[in-house]
Structure formats: structure tokens, C-alpha cells
Curated annotation (Swiss-Prot):
The organism's place on the tree of life at top rank: Bacteria
Protein name: Small ribosomal subunit protein uS17
Family in the record: Belongs to the universal ribosomal protein uS17 family.
Record-level GO cellular component terms: cytosolic small ribosomal subunit
PANTHER family reported for this sequence: 40S RIBOSOMAL PROTEIN S11 FAMILY MEMBER, SMALL RIBOSOMAL SUBUNIT PROTEIN US17M
A Pfam family the protein falls into: Ribosomal_S17
UniProt feature, compositional bias: Low complexity: 1-21
This protein's UniProt keywords: Ribonucleoprotein, Ribosomal protein, RNA-binding, rRNA-binding
Native organism taxonomy: Bacteria, Bacillati, Actinomycetota, Actinomycetes, Mycobacteriales
Record-linked PROSITE patterns: RIBOSOMAL_S17
Length: 119
């Protein structure tokens, strides 16, 4: 009985040694995985409606959708918080935005450029 157990241990260790040897041989042949391409980021153009926070502006985005049955164009707006690192934008400016990683609880956009300053 004892010999059978030691024989089993010997075969297990031999198999483990063979596996280690195989992994060492596999190293040079292994090709690294290519990085996953980043998805396309959303970009929007809107108007600044508030700049009272530090490094944050509120931008109103307009969306026009044709009603499926009646054909009337319906205008909907939504307000988003945008990261403005240099606090360059002011109320009334037309700005370009890009979607980014979450910067705070409600901030997921960043300012790309100011397209037109308010008069």
C-alpha cells in the first residue's frame, strides 16, 4: 500500500515537472495579447447655462427628433455637467464637449474647445 502511494506521488511530481518544462518552452512562442481598442467617444455641441462652480460648467444640449407618426420635429434639451479645467468658458458660450470617464457623481463630460464666445 505504501509503495502504491509513493508511486502515485512520484507520477504526480513527474507530471508537474513536465508541465513546468512545457510552460518554460511555451514562453518564447507565446505572443502577447493586443490591447483592446477604445470605443468611439460621444461628442456634442451645446451652450453654457451656468459657470458658478469651480472647474465645472453646466451645458444645455439640444436634441431634435422627428415624431414617428405625425412627422413634427420635437426639440428636447438636457443639461449636463462638464469639466472645465481652466474655467475658461462663460455663460452663453457655444462649446464642444467629449464624453469621458466619470469625474464625479454627476460629471461625465469634458470641455474640448470654446467654439464661439458670448457677446
Amino acid at each position: 500500500m505504501a509503495e502504491a502511494k509513493t508511486g502515485a506521488k512520484a507520477t504526480k511530481s513527474a507530471a508537474a515537472g513536465a508541465a513546468d518544462g512545457a510552460s518554460k518552452e511555451k514562453g518564447p512562442k507565446h505572443t502577447p495579447s493586443t490591447p483592446k481598442p477604445r470605443g468611439r467617444r460621444k461628442t456634442r455641441i451645446g451652450y453654457v447655462v451656468s459657470d458658478k462652480m469651480q472647474k465645472t460648467i453646466v451645458v444645455e444640449l439640444e436634441d431634435r427628433v422627428r415624431h414617428p407618426l405625425y412627422g413634427k420635429i420635437i426639440r428636447t434639451t438636457k443639461k449636463v455637467k462638464v469639466h472645465d479645467e481652466h474655467s475658461a468658458a462663460g455663460i452663453g458660450d457655444r462649446v464642444s464637449l467629449m464624453e469621458t470617464r466619470p469625474l464625479s457623481a454627476t460629471k461625465r463630460w469634458r470641455l474640448v474647445e470654446i467654439l464661439e464666445k458670448a457677446k
